Amino acid sequence: MDVLSPGQGNNTTSPPAPFETGGNTTGISDVTFSYQVITSLLLGTLIFCAVLGNACVVAAIALERSLQNVANYLIGSLAVTDLMVSVLVLPMAALYQVLNKWTLGQVTCDLFIALDVLCCTSSILHLCAIALDRYWAITDPIDYVNKRTPRRAAALISLTWLIGFLISIPPMLGWRTPEDRSDPDACTISKDHGYTIYSTFGAFYIPLLLMLVLYGRIFRAARFRIRKTVKKVEKTGADTHHGASPAPQPKKSVNGESGSRNWRLGVESKAGGGLCANGAVRQGDDGAALEVIEVHRVGNSKEHLPLPSEAGPTPCAPASFERKNERNAEAKRKMALARERKTVKTLGIIMGTFILCWLPFFIVALVLPFCESSCHMPTLLGAIINWLGYSNSLLNPVIYAYFNKDFQNAFKKIIKCKFCRQ
């Protein structure tokens, strides 16, 4: 999507397609050789990195079984969409930028604009689909496990492409102005005011509002759970300080034996005294001591279950046990707060990158068609805004995949050709 067509008039395009600059624009129609070389190197590097990054994400999901789940299907579809932007749209946009004029003819121009709008809009809407999937997963985790199916992912993906088609096709069906094709050296999308509002709101402003609402609620839900964990830990620590050991909690183990159950007593009776061993015993409501047993279940999981003990009442935990639990409670509290900070950072990166890349373009896309005679857009600024939007297709795989440890392991396998050996 070109925000400003090189060296042209102050006519705009709707997102995400080329703009033209008007007579008030500062720029040159005849570019220098050094400009062409430098621009070619910069844009060529951006395109190469975008193709490589998105192709690696697609390959990782296709080759690594552990990555083949509904959440990653959406990320994989996003990578395919950004790969289409990188292969089908960016080369023509780069040529347009380097030559400072459109040289591929009107038919190719129409195809370029349609692909530009379709792929960039679908890419943005994929980010909404991922946000919606994450919102359902964190706010309704129990029920959504059964609803989170490949069919639902396919429906979300299909919806993103359908909306993209509904936004990209109208100019080809006549929703444009007579001036849109008046200059053979320029390639611009419809400057019709109605289409400008329709396309900018459908492709960006409504998705932006939806993402802000969804990620805002995701953050609130995550913060609520984290702080609930902190309060629970602090309450457990307070109970321990007053003489009662905390109730045993379920924990996982990888030592389970398939097809059988192993029962092991976590506390053993000692003659001549009460039971007190690393917090595995607590005073029951009926005064009886509770022993902890470990249950090894099929599926490599271990659970701790309290059972009444035949021993008598248990004395309070020793001071060393209290200090240990206080330290554990403080450590868990710090971990919970660190998780909250990480959540803020992650959501900030996701929304910050999206807004930084696309907001400048869509502000220009919405405003410029309504002030053609009075608005002034420097050519260089227009090019920066334009390619800032395109760069989102390069950054998406970094944000949604490369920060994920499972994807990192798959990428290492790809680099070391482990999949080839298999």
Curated annotation (Swiss-Prot):
- The yes or no answer to whether the keyword Oxidoreductase is present is no
Recorded protein name is 5-hydroxytryptamine receptor 1A
Q: Which keywords fit this entry according to its UniProt record?
A: Behavior, Cell membrane, Cell projection, Disulfide bond, G-protein coupled receptor, Glycoprotein, Membrane, Receptor, Transducer, Transmembrane, Transmembrane helix
Q: Which residues have a glycan attached per UniProt?
A: 10-11, 24
Q: How is its activity regulated?
A: G-protein coupled receptor activity is regulated by lipids: phosphatidylinositol 4-phosphate increases HTR1A-mediated activity.
Say where the protein is mainly found.
membrane
Q: Where is this motif: DRY motif?
A: 133-135
- Give TM segment ranges: 39-59, 74-98, 108-132, 153-174, 194-216, 347-370, 379-403
Spell out the InterPro entries in the cross-references: 5HT1A_rcpt (IPR000610), 5HT_rcpt (IPR002231), GPCR_Rhodpsn (IPR000276), GPCR_Rhodpsn_7TM (IPR017452)
Family membership noted in the UniProt record: Belongs to the G-protein coupled receptor 1 family. 5-hydroxytryptamine receptor subfamily. HTR1A sub-subfamily.
**What's in the GO CC field?**
dendrite; plasma membrane
The opening ranks of the lineage are: Eukaryota, Metazoa, Chordata, Craniata, Vertebrata
Q: Does the keyword Glycoprotein apply?
A: yes
Quaternary organization: Heterodimer; heterodimerizes with GPER1. Interacts with YIF1B. Interacts with GPR39 and GALR1.
The UniProt entry, under PROSITE patterns, shows: G_PROTEIN_RECEP_F1_1, G_PROTEIN_RECEP_F1_2
**Residue ranges of the region described as Disordered:** 1-23, 235-263
Question: At which positions is serotonin bound?
Answer: 116, 120
Instruction: Name the species this protein comes from.
Output: Pongo pygmaeus (Bornean orangutan)
- Annotated gene: HTR1A
Q: Which CDD domains match?
A: 7tmA_5-HT1A_vertebrates (cd15330)
Where the record places motif NPxxY motif is 396-400
Name which cysteines form disulfide bonds.
Answer: 109-187
Extracellular topological domain ranges are 1-38, 99-107, 175-193, 371-378
Which Pfam families would you find in this protein's record? 7tm_1
Q: Name one GO biological process term.
A: regulation of behavior
